[in-house]
From Swiss-Prot:
Keywords: ATP-binding, Helicase, Hydrolase, Nucleotide-binding
SMART domains, per database record: DEXDc, HELICc, RQC
Family assignment from sequence similarity: Belongs to the DEAD box helicase family. DEAH subfamily.
Residues that, per the record, bind ATP: L51, M52, T53, S54, A55, G56, K57, S58
Protein's UniProt name: Putative ATP-dependent RNA helicase R290
GO molecular function, one term: RNA helicase activity
Length: 548
């Protein structure tokens, strides 16, 4: 019981709400900060609440609506999430509806809403703009207990999952000035939280935050091997008959991993945005009902999963930001039992993520997302406590060691030179890369091809003419992973750029030298002037992980 709740235990309202909590939900006690949020909403106050996954966000808007006996409107981004909530409420004997693109007879549902048939009205952000008049009438005729905006981080341009549709729902204060707004999220930094308050015009700019710590989650990071089966199958075998989610970066990778698991006689479902709604619904339902234990998915299988006994979450590929990663591992251990989160990465993953980011033409978006990606890179490469890195990212103070992550438990203590970061001067190698690319005109090669050339690979894709290139084999003393890091840093610093070219059915990613890169090499050739060149084209020492 937190201090706020302790100060209210003798009030009549507190006793009524505790009785409601027990009668409807079967719980004896509120979770941290729950009562404070509920009480403020009942008082008509706006609230921005940041509660970790499994902290009971739904009760924060359900209990006020039941207590006030007025309908609540909930903005939710996923149809699957709405349906999950509707089914849960149905089991509790509480009426609710989901107004979204799947509804065939919207006119009838609007009529039912105005006849007060539903206590909870779930609406997608895309659909709510068409319900303005109905919402105003509902407030005039019966009153609305609150407007709840779930996954509120989607409204902030500073957040990891900004969605344009959420920007269209900022009208509530104009049409319902006296109805409290409850903005809810499990993943928001202080900057994002304040932006949520500003955009929604809340009468508060200070969020109510509970701890982000999920002490029952074990955190471990590993580098990918050349064979995904060697990485994933042993983990699945370590936790037999347990519910497992495996996240992949792309739809193609999702299918590939699912096929590999099938070959190894591992039964799994697959879920990504390219599949039919029928297929996705079946996978989702079968997983929730334990008909399948393992799902391989993209992040499309994220917010809509309300399964308490997920025991393992595997990220096969570096996530693009810490907020998304935190939300996805939050699918694990919602029952409070110990659960295990593994992340596999290589530096090609970061190049893939940069490519995704570059496909958005908004420079502010690119800048924000690239900064978030760098934070994720630090998480997977640093040797300090993983939990400490996560919690400090969310502006939460914590102890130096959690004793429940790979770094604290000494998992890597016998591994030489893996994931040890150091600042390295790679000017000569950077110059080698740029000169190699410039020496092969009219060629559209990706990072891996240039690395193969530098390392003197015997790959058949390297033509005899290129094998005669003076740079062929000059980088053989360094590993492919090491070279990938150098390429990644050169792209990050603007000396190279990754360009998408459509040469056939599918686009390919090729590497080009930028004007900044050409200028830098020209100056680097002057040798003695290298340390005195203009800072705008200076190559900084880079933080490297791979040592050879």
């Amino acid at each position: 019981m937190d201090d706020y709740e302790k100060s209210k235990v003798l009030t009549k309202r507190y006793k009524k709400l505790k009785k409601l909590l027990k009668m409807v939900y079967g719980y004896d006690n509120f979770r941290p900060r729950q009562y404070e949020i509920i009480n403020k909403v009942i008082n008509g106050e706006d609230v921005c609440a940041i509660l970790m996954t499994s902290a009971g966000k739904s009760l924060c808007f359900q209990i006020p609506a039941l207590y006030l006996d007025k309908p609540a409107i909930i903005i939710s981004p996923l149809i699957s999430l709405m349906e999950d909530q509707r089914l849960i409420l149905e089991k509790l004997g509480i009426s609710s509806c989901c107004y979204n693109s799947n509804v065939e007879n919207k006119a009838q549902m609007r009529k039912d809403i105005m006849q007060f048939k539903y206590k909870f009205i779930y609406v997608s952000p895309e659909s709510v703009v068409h319900l303005k008049d109905l919402i105003v009438k509902l407030e005039d005729f019966q009153g609305i207990s609150l407007i709840a905006i779930d996954e509120a981080h989607c409204i902030s341009a500073y957040g990891f999952d900004f969605r344009t549709a959420y920007r269209e729902i900022t009208f509530f204060k104009e049409i319902l000035p006296n109805v409290p707004i409850l903005a809810l999220t499990a993943t928001a930094t202080n900057i994002v939280a304040k932006d949520i308050c500003k955009v929604l015009q809340l009468k508060t700019n200070e969020p109510i935050k509970a701890s982000f710590d999920r002490p029952n989650l074990y955190l471990e990071v590993r580098t990918k091997s050349k064979n995904p089966a060697n990485d994933i199958v042993p983990i699945i075998n370590k936790y037999p008959n347990q519910s497992v989610i495996i996240y992949c970066l792309t739809k193609k990778e999702t299918q590939k991993i699912a096929d590999i698991l099938t070959v190894h006689k591992v039964v799994c479902g697959i879920y990504h945005a390219g599949l039919s709604n029928e297929h996705k619904t079946k996978t989702h339902t079968n997983f929730i009902n334990n008909k399948i234990k393992i799902v391989v998915a993209t992040i499309a299988f994220g917010m809509g999963i309300n399964k308490p006994d997920v025991r393992v979450v595997i990220h096969y590929g570096a996530p693009k930001n810490i907020e998304g990663y935190y939300q996805e591992i939050g699918r694990a251990g919602r029952d409070g039992e110990k659960s295990y989160c593994y992340a596999f990465y290589n530096f090609q993953d970061f190049m893939i993520q940069r490519r995704f980011i570059s496909q958005n033409n908004n420079p502010n978006y690119q800048k924000t997302q690239l900064a978030l990606l760098e934070q994720m890179k630090k998480y997977v490469t640093l040797r300090t406590c993983r939990r400490k890195i996560l919690l400090e990212y969310f502006d939460e103070e914590t102890k130096e060691k959690c004793d429940f992550c790979d770094n604290c438990c000494g998992v890597h203590k016998n591994i030489v030179n893996e994931n040890v970061t150091s600042k390295q001067n790679v000017q000569s190698e950077a110059k080698l890369i740029i000169e190699l690319i410039e020496s092969i005109p009219n060629r559209n090669f990706g990072v891996n091809m240039y690395i193969n050339i530098l390392r003197g690979s015997k790959n058949k894709a390297i033509s005899p003419a290129i094998r005669k290139n003076k740079y062929y084999g000059l980088g053989s003393k360094h590993s492919s992973e090491w070279w990938k890091e150098v390429f990644d840093n050169l792209i990050k610093q603007g000396f190279l750029q990754s360009v998408s070219l459509k040469t056939g059915k599918f686009p390919i990613q090729v590497v080009k030298v930028t004007n900044k890169g050409v200028t830098w090499v020209s100056m680097a050739d002057l040798g003695s002037l290298l340390d005195n060149i203009d800072n705008s084209v200076k190559l900084d020492p880079v933080e490297m992980v791979a040592s050879v």
